[in-house]
Amino acid sequence: MPGKIAVEVAYALPEKQYLQRVTLQEGATVEEAIRASGLLELRTDIDLTKNKVGIYSRPAKLSDTVHDGDRVEIYRPLIADPKELRRQRAEKSANK
């Protein structure tokens, strides 16, 4: 009989951070942890088909298994291309 595990689910916005602790059955997936957290109901801007997820800052799939003590993170989409931002900063500093 599988035991219970405790997992945190995190979602951060510039103005607010959400951190929900959930208890799941061993063998639960990242997606099950997110759904159990209630964040999908709280934040309608989270779309699991678009938002990337991870466990402790490492990319993960929704089907990956979570372990006791894991922190599942839901990432926001990038607003700007990091390469483009670096290029713009380099041009700006070159023009000084």
UniProtKB/Swiss-Prot annotation:
InterPro entries hit by this protein: Mopterin_synth/thiamin_S_b (IPR016155), RnfH (IPR005346), RnfH_sf (IPR037021)
Disulfide bonds listed in the record: none
Coiled-coil intervals in this record? none
User: Which superkingdom?
Assistant: Bacteria
Task: Read off the Pfam families from this record.
Answer: Ub-RnfH
Protein family (similarity comment): Belongs to the UPF0125 (RnfH) family.
Q: Which HAMAP family match?
A: UPF0125_RnfH
What is the name of this protein? Protein RnfH
What lineage does the source organism belong to? Bacteria, Pseudomonadati, Pseudomonadota, Gammaproteobacteria, Enterobacterales
The gene behind this protein is rnfH
